[in-house]
């Protein structure tokens, strides 16, 4: 049985701006995000971690840097943990995207959708499932910290409970939250979901009118 600790990156500049960042380069953490990172080492103090694997995106690497040092672990990069390729939607305001005709399809039938010049949800699900299967076979007794993005965590939770791709948008994942799952060849278990492990004094969230999710949580873009 392999235990996966999914840590969504801390609050980012894109979160602050209500932007769908996707795989755009040069997007780091916000002021709130750096404040969250300062508390991560303490939050993980008593948690066993055998290895750390991260998305290659800047906001993920900034999230895990000091935590990895405190655990004296090297951070490996796996491109399968990268955020979804939202294609031509990348860099756009979520307030604008939520008014587009395709938004309803993304929320209710994501299995049928591919982003223009980007990735399909089926492809995203396939790369995450392949990664988790490979890691659980290779490291059957380890606890692995994965630093990644909102939609990846949501897909992993959906795969674990067997809710199906068309229901994964019902999950919501906050920045710097922890989701814990275990996988083996015979079973999959969701141990905890969207656990708030750090808080920032005075932290404020931007609420989207749609109440739907893309890229993470309902109330943080």
Q: Where on the chain are the PLM-derived regions?
A:
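A glycine-rich beta-strand to alpha-helix segment
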Residues: 139-153
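Phosphate-handling substructures
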Residues: 14, 69-129, 182, 189-192, ...
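Short, active-site-adjacent cap segments at secondary-structure transitions
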Residues: 13, 59-61, 83-84, 152-154
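Active-site signature of alpha/beta-hydrolase-fold catalytic machinery across serine-
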Residues: 66, 155-159
